[in-house]
Amino acid sequence: MLYYSMPALAAGFILDLMIGDPRWLYHPVCLIGNLIAFLEKILRKIFPKTDKGELAAGTVEVIFVCLLSGGIPFLILHILYGISVWAGFALETFWCYQLLATKSLKTESMKVYDRLKNGTLDEARYAVSMIVGRDTQSLTEEGVTKAAVETVAENASDGVIAPMLYMAIGGVWLMFLYKGINTMDSMLGYKNDKYLYFGRCAAKLDDVANYIPARLSGWLMVAASAFVKMDVKNAAKIYRRDRRNHASPNSAQTEAAMAGALEVQLAGNAYYFGKLYEKPTIGDGIRPVEVEDIRRSNRLLYATAIL
């Protein structure tokens, strides 16, 4: 089965670049998200509402989601490859195509670009709110642009490089397992009263799962900046200096490479759920952020993915 994973990865990646995610096609990550929400609701009723109880409930959730998100695709593919190699290859290619987010990331970020160029600031704020977790209602044009660029940078690892790496290692079932871990972190990994203990296991596991992919993505992005005629020396400098400027051990890896390549400053303070979070900046800000940086960030994303 693993013998066919690399050709399926190549075919799935090409399909992702060409087609992206059609809105009418149900996405498997939505199914994983529904599973996470369902299990959370059940487990919160079963376990006591104490710190230890929530930690235990969150750990049980992680175990179940990992078993189901990786195990079910593995079993389906194992059975299908046993029936027909071509059927197994076709499904593995299709799932790979669905789980990669290269074109959809470009499409969504370019909606922000379009609203900044041809619409109103409120429309741009709404467009960027669809792809970021921070509060966007009071963002300036520069703030909206930075948010879009940061999302492209961070998701270059989470949505493209990391899934490809895991599929190359173990096949598409391992890509599914990674997406299960990553989706749990995005839904449960908040450091607030509700998820501080319940989401701790999910957040820690996501840190582990992304440790190598994030660093690989950072260096790939530094190298890719040379192919799209960006500042490769500054990308390497800022990456080495600022790649730890984030509460997460992984999130700043590609943001630092992106900031250096574009010669801009990213990150900094942001509001989440009405509360100000003070965060260090990334990059020197050789020049101010401008709307065209969204387009440039996508060029760098594609170059990184192809490398």
Residue ranges, per PLM feature:
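Hydrophobic alpha-helical transmembrane segments
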Residues: M1-L177, I181, G189-L307
